[in-house]
């Protein structure tokens, strides 16, 4: 069908000449270096860190030469979560987790930085001289000396930003900018407003009523006049939704038009660096003219006062005069949704203290000048004079949560959008120097989800090979333990609890491999001493030594005679019969005041067959906890029992220390539920 409107090809209007060595060269001999920017994650930055990042931006911008353009471009594009169901090792709960979040919408954020070197003439041109309005573009010649100096300043800029430790700049390659046969480049993605790897070619409609790219309808809000700006700017603001009377949650000043704006949009931030001295000289001249005309109009006197204040600030604090511009370019393929987006953008700008200005006239030229590499085409009348410091406050300073690169971790969800992310809170923080150990402390009021989160954590740790030992109060982990017990057909998921029908029982004298190392022997000896002596009784060296010798003799006898059933009853009988006889036949007698074996046997009689606690140390299940990867000790019913609780505590300590000593290269976790001091 024949087009009745005035039309042309993108090729004839494209202002870009070439992309070489990571630099975009325009037909007007402007050179642009592109970076991908990695910002810190949302809700993880303090007020002091925001100030440090702001200071780094200001310091870096000052190293750029005159007639440079700093263009920071933040893309916020709606995407949907794609589940990882193709993995073979997914458990039932992991697979259910992935299915639950299938197609979950979220706002993906990508940040780019373009540093452009242009000329004085290009920096001053207005929108009617845009390359979009020219009939043809005649390429100009590059100045080699200018390029060398500019590239040196770009390297300094990159080094200053990267040295902060909060922001990382990565130089983009030619393929990332122009694309390959299989993937679209950034320039092509911008022309179609799509971050898909393979983007479709779209017609661009620059009609007077509305700009369209394919089915996408654009709306543009600009901050291009000082009258639209807030009375005060800062590096960061308090985020009231997550702040309390005692704690502050901080976000950057521009966060309302960043991740907090839930729609497809691009936030463009421009700082245009002119000749500082020329700017001040021009303002001095304007101030004199205003002073001369002040008798004819009071507004001239007021303008003169404002100009004087600007000049005084520049001279007093050594501030650099620059021009700035900020705009939010949003789009939608639905007219009703676009109407809602316009209101949302205006509302978010208002929360920043700005006057929302819906710009319908300059949308095509501002879209064109926001093209990567075409920053020098920015219309001068759309900028306002400011200083570097207040202008940099309008930079977004955070991104959404990123998945950890570590293969080990847990699945959590983004606090803002609910998108699942892979998070390593054990290894990666140590590698990055954030922590020096893997200890964790979970704090929260009743009902805040401490046990719920810990169930989620230990299940995923267990499924990745971790040995988990839990000390529980309140049966918070009974369900998870039963799940593991049934899944492993009883081989794992050991749950110890005390009931009248099934009292808690152990067998400290049993091991699968028959090995009793030094730690194991010491733990059994400590257990026996705890059962024998009261808390305020002192254990002598003779008593400790004799008990250690008796234990060693019993273990040697048990190793030689496989008919002996390893349990406390067998040890008690050995002490009563064999060891007592051995003591009587010694050439050096052992007196009762040194080691009273009768008192030992009498005190421990209650744990022997027929005694009150004969179940405690004579378990018939013969479970060696060394090889069990998920063990829960539910101690709620015995925590006040002075007889049982010390024994269970020692068993727990022995089990975990045994794992610590003997399981080399295996991740181990000890969790104390309700660890009150």
Question: Locations of the language-model features?
Answer:
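An acidic- and aromatic-residue-enriched active-site/binding cleft used to recognize and process polar
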Residues: 40, 73-76, 116-118, 333, ...
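The start of beta-strands in P-loop NTPase/AAA+ ATPase cores
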Residues: 31, 111, 467, 629, ...
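Glycine-rich phosphate-binding loop of nucleotide-binding enzymes
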Residues: 47, 55-62, 73, 408-497
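Short glycine/proline-enriched loop/turn "hinge" motifs that connect secondary-structure elements
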Residues: 23-29, 102-107, 316-321, 413-415, ...
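Glycine- and acidic
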Residues: 37-45, 139, 323-331, 435-443, ...
């Amino acid at each position: 069908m024949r087009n009745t409107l005035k039309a042309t090809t993108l090729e004839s209007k494209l202002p870009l000449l070439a992309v070489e060595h990571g630099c975009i060269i325009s037909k007007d001999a402007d050179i642009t270096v592109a970076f991908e920017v990695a910002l810190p994650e949302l809700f993880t930055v303090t007020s002091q860190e925001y100030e440090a990042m702001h200071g780094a931006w200001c310091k870096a911008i000052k190293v750029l030469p005159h007639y440079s353009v700093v263009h920071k471009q933040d893309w916020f594009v709606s995407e949907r979560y794609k589940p990882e169901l193709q993995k073979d090792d997914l458990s039932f709960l992991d697979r259910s987790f992935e299915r639950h979040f299938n197609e979950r919408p979220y706002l993906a954020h990508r940040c780019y930085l373009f540093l452009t070197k242009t000329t004085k003439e290009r920096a001053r041109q207005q929108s009617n001289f845009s390359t979009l309005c020219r009939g043809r573009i005649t390429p100009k010649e590059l100045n080699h000396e200018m390029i060398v100096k500019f590239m040196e300043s770009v390297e300094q800029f990159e080094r200053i930003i990267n040295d902060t430790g909060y922001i990382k700049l990565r130089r983009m390659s030619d393929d990332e900018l122009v694309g390959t046969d299989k993937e679209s480049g950034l320039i092509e993605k911008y022309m179609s407003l799509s971050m898909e790897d393979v983007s479709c070619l779209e017609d661009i409609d620059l009609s007077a009523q509305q700009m369209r790219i394919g089915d996408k309808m654009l709306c543009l809000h600009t901050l291009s006049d000082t009258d639209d700006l807030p009375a005060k700017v800062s590096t960061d603001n308090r985020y009231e939704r997550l702040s309390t009377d005692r704690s502050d949650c901080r976000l950057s000043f521009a966060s309302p038009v960043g991740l907090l704006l839930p729609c497809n949009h691009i936030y463009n931030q421009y700082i245009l660096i002119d000749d500082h001295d020329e700017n001040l000289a021009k303002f001095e001249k304007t101030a004199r003219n205003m002073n001369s005309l002040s008798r004819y109009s009071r507004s001239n006197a007021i303008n003169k006062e404002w100009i004087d204040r600007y000049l005084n600030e520049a001279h007093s604090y050594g501030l650099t005069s620059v021009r700035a511009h900020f705009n939010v370019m949003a789009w939608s393929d639905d007219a009703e949704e676009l109407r809602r987006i316009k209101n949302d953008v205006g509302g978010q700008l208002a929360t920043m203290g700005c006057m929302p200005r819906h710009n319908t006239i300059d949308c095509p030229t501002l879209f064109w000048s926001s093209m990567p590499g075409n920053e020098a085409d920015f219309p001068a009348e759309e900028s306002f004079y400011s200083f570097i410091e207040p202008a940099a406050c309008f930079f977004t300073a955070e991104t959404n949560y990123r998945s950890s690169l570590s293969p080990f971790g847990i699945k959590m969800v983004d606090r803002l959008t609910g998108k699942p992310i892979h998070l390593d809170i054990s290894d990666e923080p140590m590698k990055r120097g954030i922590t020096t150990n893997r200890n964790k402390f979970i704090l929260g009021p009743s009902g805040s989800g401490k046990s719920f989160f810990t169930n989620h954590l230990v299940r995923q740790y267990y499924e990745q090979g971790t040995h988990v030992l839990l000390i529980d109060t309140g049966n918070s982990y009974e369900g998870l333990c039963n799940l593991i017990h049934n899944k492993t057909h009883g081989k794992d998921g050991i749950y110890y609890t005390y009931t009248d029908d099934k009292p808690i029982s152990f067998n400290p004298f049993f091991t699968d491999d028959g090995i009793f190392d030094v730690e194991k022997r010491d733990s059994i000896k400590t257990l026996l001493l705890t059962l024998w002596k009261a808390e305020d009784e002192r254990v002598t060296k003779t008593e400790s030594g004799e008990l250690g010798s008796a234990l060693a003799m019993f273990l040697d006898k048990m190793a030689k005679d496989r008919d002996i059933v390893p349990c406390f009853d067998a040890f008690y009988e050995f002490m009563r019969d064999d060891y007592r006889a051995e003591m009587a036949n010694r050439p050096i007698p052992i007196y009762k005041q040194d080691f009273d074996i009768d008192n030992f046997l009498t005190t421990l009689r209650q744990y022997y067959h027929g005694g009150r606690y004969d179940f405690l140390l004579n378990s018939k299940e013969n479970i060696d906890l060394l090889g069990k990867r998920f063990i829960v000790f539910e101690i709620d019913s015995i925590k006040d029992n002075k007889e049982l609780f010390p024994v269970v505590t020692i068993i727990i300590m022995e089990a975990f220390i045994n794992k610590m000593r003997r399981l080399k290269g295996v991740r181990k976790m000890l969790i104390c539920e309700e660890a009150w001091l």
